[in-house]
Design a protein with these regions (language model features):
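Generic N-terminal amphipathic, Lys/Arg-enriched alpha-helix
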Residues: 1-16
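A short, well-structured juxtamembrane/interface segment
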Residues: 16-34
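Glycine-rich, small/polar surface segments that engage phosphate groups of diverse ligands
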Residues: 30-112
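A short, small-residue-rich loop immediately preceding and capping a beta-strand
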Residues: 36-41, 115-127
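Short glycine/serine/threonine-rich phosphate/pyrophosphate-binding segments
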Residues: 46-51, 128-135, 157
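A charged, well-structured terminal subsegment
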Residues: 107-113, 173-210
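Short, glycine/polar-rich helix-capping loops at beta-to-alpha or helix-loop-helix junctions
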Residues: 148-161
Length: 210
C-alpha cells in the first residue's frame, strides 16, 4: 500500500501544468515589486495549507542564512483569511459560513484597490465551496488576480479564477472516501505549490541582492 501511495503521487505530480505554477509565480513577483497584498484562504485541510503558506511566504524569502541574524529586506504583505478563528466563527454565526472570507475582504478593499496589484490564492478540495467562490467573486470586482489550487475538476472556482491549478486523477489509497477520493494527493500538491512559490521568491530576492 505504501508503494501505491507514492506511485499515485508521482503520476499525479507529473501531470500538473507547470506553466500555470510559473504564471502564478510571475504574478506573485509583481505583487512584491508593487507592494501589493497576497490573500490566502482554504477549507478543512486547505485551511492548514493556507496557514503554512502564509507563514512561509512572510518569512523564508527574507531570512538570513544564519536564522538568528535579522534582515531589513522589504517583505511581502500576506493576509491569511483563514487565520482568525474568532473572526471566522463570528461571521459564520452572525451572517453565515458562506461569508466567512468575503466579509473579511471588506476590511481591505477600497475603491482605489482596483489600481493596486493584489493576488488571491485559494486552496480547495473541490473548488465548489460557497465561501471560496464568494470571496473570489468579490476579489475580482476589485481587480485582484485570483488563483485556486483544487482537485476533482476544479469546480466553480476554476471557472472564475485567472489561474486555475487543478490536481488531476483519483486515488485508491485507503482513508479517502466518497467525493474526497483524491484528497491526500490534492493537499500534498497544494503544499508543494506553496513551497515552490516561496522558494522561487527567495531566489528572486537573493538574485536581486535585496
Amino acid at each position: 500500500m505504501i508503494e501505491l501511495f507514492f506511485e499515485e503521487k508521482f503520476k499525479i505530480f507529473k501531470s500538473i501544468e507547470y506553466a500555470l505554477i510559473q504564471k502564478l509565480y510571475e504574478e506573485l513577483i509583481q505583487v512584491y515589486i508593487n507592494d501589493g497584498i497576497v490573500f490566502t484562504m482554504g477549507n478543512g485541510g486547505g485551511t492548514s495549507v493556507a496557514n503554512g503558506f502564509a507563514v512561509d511566504l512572510r518569512t523564508h524569502p527574507f531570512t538570513h542564512e544564519d536564522k538568528s541574524v535579522t534582515t531589513e529586506v522589504r517583505r511581502i504583505r500576506v493576509i491569511d483569511l483563514s487565520e482568525s478563528s474568532g473572526m471566522i466563527t463570528g461571521i459564520a454565526n452572525d451572517i453565515g459560513p458562506e461569508s466567512i472570507y468575503s466579509e473579511q475582504l471588506k476590511n481591505w478593499f477600497r475603491e482605489d484597490s482596483v489600481a493596486q496589484k493584489n493576488l488571491m490564492i485559494a486552496f480547495s478540495g473541490s473548488g465548489n465551496s460557497k465561501n471560496i467562490v464568494n470571496a473570489i467573486e468579490m476579489a475580482k470586482k476589485y481587480g485582484v488576480t485570483t488563483s485556486c489550487v483544487s482537485g476533482r475538476g476544479g469546480g466553480a472556482a476554476s471557472k472564475l479564477v485567472d489561474i486555475p491549478i487543478i490536481v488531476p486523477g483519483n486515488s485508491n489509497f485507503p482513508g479517502q472516501t466518497g467525493k474526497n477520493d483524491n484528497n491526500f494527493h490534492i493537499e500534498e500538491l497544494q503544499v508543494s505549490v506553496g513551497h515552490i512559490l516561496t522558494g522561487l521568491l527567495k531566489g528572486y530576492v537573493n538574485q536581486k541582492g535585496l
